[in-house]
From Swiss-Prot:
NCBIfam families: S20 (TIGR00029). The lineage of its organism: Bacteria, Pseudomonadati, Pseudomonadota, Alphaproteobacteria, Hyphomicrobiales. The gene is rpsT. One of its GO terms (biological process) is translation. Residues 1-16 have a biased composition (Basic residues). This is Small ribosomal subunit protein bS20. It comes from Nitrobacter hamburgensis (strain DSM 10229 / NCIMB 13809 / X14). Pfam families: Ribosomal_S20p (PF01649). Belongs to the bacterial ribosomal protein bS20 family. InterPro entries: Ribosomal_bS20, Ribosomal_bS20_sf.
């Protein structure tokens, strides 16, 4: 249990930030899942549209340290590559 005033405040702050980060992480994962489902169905147009919504979410999560920025970039790259393979 936090004893000092500043430690109590830090605990409240951590709780708020955790809630925000969980929400953003859930949004990011959901958008990625939609892209992956479209790829699994083989629906290239739906995958492209979903990717247009997912890429900004991933990059924003990387900028805000919800995930590491390289992880976000890697995820975007791999999804884009998989969508490109659908055209062939």
């Amino acid at each position: 249990m936090a004893n000092t005033h500043s430690a109590k405040k830090a605990t409240r702050k951590i709780t708020r930030r955790t809630a925000v980060n969980k929400s953003r992480r859930t949004l990011m994962r959901g958008s990625v899942r939609i892209v992956e489902e479209a790829i699994a169905k083989g629906d290239r147009d739906a995958a492209i549209q979903a990717m247009k919504r997912a890429e900004p979410e991933l990059m924003r999560a990387g900028q805000q340290n919800i995930v590491h920025k390289n992880s976000a970039s890697r995820k975007v790259s791999r999804l884009t590559h998989r969508i490109a393979k659908l055209a062939k």
